[in-house]
Regions:
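Charge-biased, low-complexity intrinsically disordered regions
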Residues: 1-239
Length: 239
């Protein structure tokens, strides 16, 4: 049995004291079977988003909050969009999102339903000590498997496993080797809330996530938490 630890650095909360990150850990999943019901739920979330965002998505409060957060650590939000802004703009074209696999589709569905970033990462031997923090000099990011290391700006918010960067610019882009595949069986999800997204919104998204993964991927939820400035760490035992 191994231990999975997830921490949000105090430096993140210093800049964003009301930030919350929902974290949910699953094991023994079956991510191999596409499901028409899940696809229909995704289409419903896309349609609902189009009725909620009828003007410039950059000005929608839940998206504007991320643009402000990106500016704070030196990113240009018009060049490097948060995952929820990029996803929303794609849906508003209007395009339907592709069916990738159930876990990825569930993350996209929740992002659109709550208008917040939600992502999934596989858990492996080298990814059991996770931290959301600001960059360190030794950090390395590989955007593509087998590719070259990409330089990272100082002060950028990144998701890490040791010096390995799993996601750049908070919610912008995952490393090439962190993709969730059809054979993936153990994962963690991130669900992000910056005001005006509330504690209740993040908790509701976490509850939806647990229900959807149980319905469409089976497996077990090993633990879940909403991390905040008072409770920045989560520990789960993996079997």
């Amino acid at each position: 049995m191994s231990t999975f630890t997830y921490t949000v650095s105090p430096a993140v909360f210093k800049d964003h004291p009301n930030y919350r990150r929902g974290v949910v850990v699953f094991q023994d999943l079956d991510n191999s079977k596409p499901n028409p019901e899940l696809t229909e739920l995704l289409r419903t979330s896309e349609a609902a988003l189009r009725t909620r965002i009828t003007a410039n998505p950059a000005e929608f409060p839940q998206i504007a909050a991320w643009r402000d957060a990106y500016r704070l650590f030196g990113a240009k939000p018009s060049e490097h969009r948060s995952s929820i802004e990029a996803l929303s703009r794609r849906v508003l074209k209007p395009d339907n999102l592709p069916d990738i696999n159930p876990l990825v589709d569930i993350g996209n569905l929740l992002s659109l339903r709550y208008i917040l970033p939600a992502g999934v990462h596989p858990i492996g031997p080298q990814s059991t000590q996770i931290e959301l923090r600001k960059t360190a000099e030794t950090d390395r990011f590989l955007p593509d498997v087998g590719g070259s290391v990409e330089p990272i700006a100082p002060g950028e918010v990144v998701l890490t496993a040791g010096s390995r960067v799993l996601t750049r610019r908070w919610t912008w882009r995952q490393a090439g080797d962190t993709r969730t595949l059809s054979e993936t069986r153990c994962v963690f999800f991130d669900i992000d809330g910056l005001p005006p997204v509330s504690q209740g919104d993040v908790e509701a998204a976490v509850a939806d996530l647990i229900e959807l993964v149980g319905l469409y991927c089976g497996g077990r939820c090993l633990g879940h938490s909403v991390l905040d400035a008072q409770h920045p760490t989560m520990i789960v035992q993996l079997s």
